[in-house]
Curated annotation (Swiss-Prot):
Modified sites of kind Phosphoserine: S247, S248, S249, S319, S321, S844, S845
Family according to the record: Belongs to the major facilitator superfamily. Sugar transporter (TC 2.A.1.1) family. Trehalose transporter subfamily.
Taxonomic lineage: Eukaryota, Metazoa, Ecdysozoa, Arthropoda, Hexapoda
Cytoplasmic topological segments: 1-389, 461-472, 518-527, 573-635, 694-699, 761-766, 822-856
GO biological process terms on file: D-glucose transmembrane transport; trehalose transport
Bilayer-spanning residue ranges: 390-410, 440-460, 473-493, 497-517, 528-548, 552-572, 636-656, 673-693, 700-720, 740-760, 767-787, 801-821
Designated name of the protein: Facilitated trehalose transporter Tret1
Amino acid sequence: MSGRDNRGAGGGGGGHQPLSNAMGKLKEKLTRVGDELGYHRVESNLSTSNTATSLDTILPEDPFLFPQVSPQRHPQTVRTQRLLEDEPPLSFRPLLEDDDINEPPTQQQKRTPLRASGSLELTPLPPPPTSLEIREHRDRQQRGAQGDELQRSKQSLKGSRVSFERRDTGNSNTNSNKAAESSDEDSFEEKRTGFQQQKATSVDHKGILKDLKHILANDNRRQFQAKKHVSLDVKGTRFLQDLLKESSSEEEFHKTRREFQGRKHQSLDPRVTFKLDKVLQGSSTDSDEEGEDAEHKRLIHRPKDITKPVIIDLKDLESESDEDFLTSRQHFQQQRSISTDSRKSRRLYEMDEMGNKRGENIRHAVPFVRQITEDGKPKLEVYRPTTNPIFIWTQVIAALSVSLGSLVVGFVSAYTSPALVSMSDPNITSFTVTKDAGSWVGGIMPLAGLVGGVAGGPLIEYMGRRNTILATAVPFIVSSLLIACAVNVAMVLCGRFLAGFCVGIASLSLPVYLGETVQPEVRGTLGLLPTAFGNIGILVCFVAGSFMNWSMLAFLGAALPVPFLILMFLIPETPRWYVSRGREERARKALTWLRGKEADVEPELKGLMRSQADADRQATQNTMLELLKRNNLKPLSISLGLMFFQQFSGINAVIFYTVQIFKDAGSTIDGNVCTIIVGVVNFVATFIGILLIDRAGRKILLYASDIAMVLTLFVLGGFFYCKAHGPDVSHLGWLPLTCFVVYILGFSVGFGPIPWLMMGEILPAKIRGAAASVATSFNWTCTFVVTKTFQDLVGSLGAHGAFWLFGAICFVGLFFVILYVPETQGKTLEDIERKMMGRVRRMSSVANIKPLSFNM
């Protein structure tokens, strides 16, 4: 009795020591159990007067965080809770042992303090859920969150898919239904993996696509991102790869991933003007400034009507908050894929919503990519190659101006074919031209072209492309006047040497000028204008030579450079050369003239400046030693090999001595008429090459060209052999002309233009000037050897032996093309250089060809 009274009134007196000890032990046990189970610990003083409150405070209200249980009332930091499968149910009663209290309390004493304090009565808690229930609950939560994210991602993916004008509606509906049915995580991840692989396929620059697929299949996303960046990087920003690789944890990796994506886009975007990295940054603060509104509007649309570009506002592509990151990320990925795709539409496949390949290779697909909004209407069209509309007329004027120089080159090169006949006639010429002197009249021009090719490389670097071409006009006039007024063979040889020197310079500088001024979209067409005009010059020379003697023909040659000289004053220097000399403002004006006043030339100008900076860093003091490096020898040797087989096919011997060959053949057709026919075929074949060169491919045309030349040369050799040693072939007078026509046709579509085209495609940028000079000089050396020795070959081997020798060389050239020459059709210059020497080139290289007349 006394014990109960003392407990009720005392504040912790010594008379109630047993109960105090019991409560202390109870506190220790509760604290220890709470720590083991991960419960919150609340410090509270236990005493005999506040036993109920203390117990109610210490015990957790909800040990299991399930949705059906009310949330905790205490806002302390939540620690990770561990739910053990064998965890015993928590209850108050089992924690008190009988020996802890000397005087056991009654049932009323056990319940009264708690009720008096106003607290809830402690009852045994329900048993904890089993491990199966815990897993089911967690799966429901994850599926709920992932389902929302899945729907957002699918909607975003629908809004940023790639479409083409050729669309299979049936397959589209089927794939859309399949995508809608893929509502679980596994299906979405599987389709997303396919989308990533397909996207990597369209933009892979480094040929490591197999690694990408393998890594992605193994779910190593960090390594996949780093590897993919290496395959796409066109600016040497390898530090971005290290940004991912050096991440010490997944948290750090995800933390730096946005920065990586934004910076990677800047390193990959060839148009520079895109600000899509702001999509990943999740910030719109920069777009709020009025001063930058103009920067968000870029000319990135090019429909079929290129005269009506569309200006769009890139603010629509920016993310307003971090919550929009996942949604906007799909748009960013699609935009980046469009901006970095260098394989053009015929290399892409039509894709469904999830990026899976739908069917056939769309070889002739529309050359631009559309983003489709959710309502199916085009939101944005991006034409890959450039950001400016094609202002075609100024570029046509520039191409025509330099092509008139090619016409002069063609006329000068073909001059000896009709002129030597009248020059050797003593009734027309006041001086005697021996057979040996005649061979030098024909052979000294390519020898001088060799010297001009060597001098042309330094001249175009120091004087400029335009000024170098312009400087050849007056010497062309002087050389023709020297020949026209010649009173001896020496004056003719001097005139031919001066003309050949100018031809060597022009053969190098004309393609360089066009390659640096014409936009890629029209470079193939305008780049063949020099070839066409060169062949026109050959035709003009043949036609005029049929009724003019050698002196009058030379006067005509002196008049042809006059329009060429006038038009060259109207066109600007190449922006690339201005940038190399630090004249930024002049480069901007030149670009404005070439691209049009309405075009935004700043991105292209900045790209030229970056290319020049890269070229300056890679430049060495001794360029010739650079040519001997292993990586550079391979493309140089291929270019030299093509030049060798081009000239030793005998083309210049055929052109130089066409009239003489037909006279020796005893053809019933007049020799001058035959030369005109050959000139017409040569001219027509040029346009056939224009139609086929970007459709059939380089190697296919080389195969066809080589086979045609081999057959015709062997047949022509057989005809001359039968004429000299065999049966009468006078009734086959049409056969030489037929063989010549097929021979010229085959040469003009293959071995005529392609060696010069591939010289600009496969030679590395940093050695382009020196390597092109070497290749040009080698070409003229071969030309000189062939033209100078052709008459000697005919004298020693006979006409049949000379043609059979050329045919055998062409046959060997066929195997050279099969084994060593790469196919460059449809590939960017970066892809070609990576394949040839494992390096990516910055600047746009030359992709033009020397006219057939340059081969003389």
